[in-house]
Amino acid sequence: NSKTGLSGLEISERLEINRLTMTKYLNVFAAEGLLKQKNIGNVNLWFTEDGTEQYHFPEDYFKIKTKYFEYLTSRKENIIYNLIRNCFHSAAEPMKIITEIILPAIYSVHDLLDQGKIGRSELNLLEKIISNSIQIINLEGVQSDPKKNVVVISADYQSVLVSEAISASFHTDGWQVYSLGDMSPSIDVLFDLDLQKFLTKIW
């Protein structure tokens, strides 16, 4: 919580870990977006990113849901992404992140649009942030079962985010997911044949 940051040497001494080993860990945490590094002369100072915190699940899902929506409506992108990463590092279930945090946020931002509290431009920005949050979940390494395959299609542009969330939930459950996005412009008399042609390529 230090506002001035700590050097790698200070951190390694406090944790009683070899300095070189500690540096490797610090670089990994920085790559994950949990820490930021500032060079001052020959010294590297390390700071925790905003939003970095240890959570306890399942009791903290409601707390995270509230924070996520608060940060989302304040357009605090980096803090939101750190929040999702923190959930992973706090051993949250990926499926629960989607059902307890992401999906409620999707429905809530559409409610804000319906109530006239935000416009289309702001909705697009908030949806992009939610979509990026979903991609963080998709980046988590999961061993997929070659026998479990699913194609996810969005019926219109309004349900694209929901289809992305559904795709991510299948992914976290070990499915090989083919997410086609909004297919409404492609639905015509030849759509069934087109889809069958695609399916023969992947299955």
Model-derived features with residue positions:
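Short helix-capping/hinge SLiMs at alpha-helix to coil transitions
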Residues: N1-T4
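Acidic, two-metal ion nucleic-acid-processing modules in DNA metabolism proteins
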Residues: S7
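A short acidic, leucine-rich amphipathic alpha-helix
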Residues: E10-S12
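Short phosphate-binding/catalytic loops that engage adenosine nucleotides
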Residues: L15, L34, G174-Q176
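Residue-level marker of alpha-helix boundaries and capping positions
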Residues: E16-I17, Y157
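Long amphipathic alpha-helical segments
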Residues: I17-N138
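C-terminal regulatory/effector modules of DNA-binding transcriptional regulators
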Residues: G116-G119, N132-W203
